[in-house]
């Protein structure tokens, strides 16, 4: 839940970054679930399109990552996720990315 308190700050930074970033820069944004993807899509309107990890009607509770998802995460400039309480499957991949 403490990550939800940080969400307004992160969204503010992303919206400010869209004004600072040159138009031709390719910002790679990834969202873990559809509600976060929707917010990121709204903020990135005209700048780019975020990728989504849990697609369709998939549930983040029992989700299994594929190698293609790991590659998307590794190439991302910004990752939106709720936290390890909801998205346990992202805990290890994000900690390994953070070490790099």
Kindly label every feature range from the protein language model.
Residues 2, 25-100:
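Extracytoplasmic metal-acquisition and chelation regions
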Residues 2-8:
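Twin-arginine (Tat) signal peptide motif
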Residues 8-19:
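Bacterial N-terminal signal peptides
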